[in-house]
């Protein structure tokens, strides 16, 4: 295995996914690409607990604008790279339905392993694209490592009151 692609979102469980995927990649001496798929930004909370140095969305930008969404996503991925301490990590912001864009980029980049988490914005995501993790597992021709959600982090996330952006 020469290329490991780690797919994360803004969920606090993303830290465990990124760290686990990175540990596998380093053990395999593989290249790493960390990706985030942009779907409708209105499904993401503006009050997430800090994730790997990313403290949340700037409220300055019009998040109906894809360029602002991409900029914020790259800021998030930069925080992840700093957290992991490896400037050689590639980052990529993908557009479209989460599972589809992750699978397309994995093929394009010729990834040998896709690392994803079990926790997503399921209640909202299911309305539009079904569960991304199960879709990736069913449709991938590439090996997939699924990292279980950190129960402690999930508990903290559920206790926090979320405010969702409204457009």
Briefly describe each language-model feature range.
Residues 89-91:
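Rossmann-fold cofactor-recognition segment
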Residues 27, 82-87:
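Short helix-capping segments at alpha-helix termini
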